Amino acid sequence: MTFDAFTKVVAQADARGEFLSDAQLDALSRLVAEGNKRIDTVNRITGNASSIVANAARALFAEQPSLIAPGGNVYTNRRMAACLRDMEIILRYVTYAVFTGDASILDDRCLNGLRETYLALGVPGASVAEGVRKMKDAAVAIVSDRNGITQGDCSAIISELGSYFDKAAAAVA
C-alpha cells in the first residue's frame, strides 16, 4: 500500500523531470504517520490478544452463566476451546482490517456465512455478539491508552477499530 503510493509519486515527478514537491512530501509524511498509527494499534491488540479474549469470555460467562452450565452451549472443555478459538479468530481478522484500513478481509474470510454456521450448530448469535462487544471494549481501552504509542490524534483509528467490532457483532447476532 505505502510503497505503491511512494512509487507513484516518484514516477509522476520523474515523468515531469521535477523534484518531489513540498505538497507531495507532506502527503507521503501523512501516509507514513497514518501507517504508524495502524501498526501501533495492531501491535497493542496483538500483544494483548489472549487477555482480550479471556477477559471478554469471562465477563460473558459471568453475565450468562447458562452458557457454561451443564447442557449450555459452552459446556465441556471442547466447546469452551471452540468458543475461545472463534473469539480469537474474529479478533485476528479485526486486526487485519485495521492494518489494511479495509473491512473486506474481515467480511470475506471471517464473517461471511458465520451466522449461518452458528445457527446450524445451535450457537446463540446474541451471545457471540455480546462476546464480540466485550472484546471491542477491551481493545478500544487498550488502544486508547496513550502510553508508549505514536503521538497524534488517534480518534479516527479508534472509531474505525470500533466499527469493525460492530460489524462482526452485527454479522453474528
From Swiss-Prot:
Post-translational modification N4-methylasparagine, affected residues: N73
Transport listed as a keyword: yes
Residues where (2R,3E)-phycocyanobilin 1 binds: C83
After translation, the protein is modified as follows:
Contains two covalently linked bilin chromophores.
One Pfam family linked to the record? Phycobilisome
Where along this sequence does the record place binding of (2R,3E)-phycocyanobilin 2?
C154
Tell me how this protein sits in the membrane: Peripheral membrane protein
Question: Which protein family is it in?
Answer: Belongs to the phycobiliprotein family.
Q: This chain belongs to which protein, by name? A: C-phycocyanin-2 beta subunit
Q: Which gene encodes it?
A: cpcB2
